């Protein structure tokens, strides 16, 4: 095992819930403004999850005031306070880029039971 692998293993988080593309999440992100810090909640649908280990990331998409907003988070980032899984989506793809063109009811995802 290389030295870098040991450093990476020490920084992996173990409090991340199981989720995949199509799931709706609440991501509580620590935002530091000057000397104050607060939590900001970003709620949306996971459209992709890629890489593995310490470099693993996921992208969440939501529509805010009619504008599509996507944000990519590192899974093991210390800036993420917690992740809540709100619903599990039933999808047949690992990357849901087609949701970018969908509007309204066409962008809905069925819930997995």
Curated annotation (Swiss-Prot):
Tell me which Pfam families the record gives: Ribosomal_L19
Protein's UniProt keywords contain Nucleotidyltransferase = no
The terms describing its cellular component in GO are: cytosolic large ribosomal subunit
Protein name per Swiss-Prot or TrEMBL: Large ribosomal subunit protein bL19
Cite a single GO BP annotation: translation
Q: Which domain of life is it from?
A: Bacteria
Entry-linked PANTHER family: LARGE RIBOSOMAL SUBUNIT PROTEIN BL19M (PTHR15680:SF9), RIBOSOMAL PROTEIN L19 (PTHR15680)
The record's listing under InterPro entries reads:
Ribosomal_bL19 (IPR001857), Ribosomal_bL19_CS (IPR018257), Ribosomal_bL19_sf (IPR038657), Translation_prot_SH3-like_sf (IPR008991)
Q: Which GO terms describe its molecular function?
A: structural constituent of ribosome
Family designation? Belongs to the bacterial ribosomal protein bL19 family.
Task of the protein: This protein is located at the 30S-50S ribosomal subunit interface and may play a role in the structure and function of the aminoacyl-tRNA binding site.
Going by the UniProt record, its keywords in alphabetical order are:
Ribonucleoprotein, Ribosomal protein
């Amino acid at each position: 095992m290389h030295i870098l692998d040991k450093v990476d293993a020490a920084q992996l988080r173990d409090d991340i819930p199981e989720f995949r593309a199509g799931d709706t999440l609440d991501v509580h992100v620590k935002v530091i403004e000057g000397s104050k810090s607060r939590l900001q909640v970003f709620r949306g649908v996971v459209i992709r999850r890629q890489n593995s280990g310490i470099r693993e990331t996921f992208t969440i998409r939501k529509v805010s005031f009619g504008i599509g907003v996507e944000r990519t988070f590192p899974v093991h980032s210390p800036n993420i306070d917690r992740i809540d899984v709100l619903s599990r989506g039933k999808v047949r793809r690992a990357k849901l880029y087609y949701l970018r063109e969908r509007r309204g009811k066409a962008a809905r995802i069925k819930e997995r039971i």
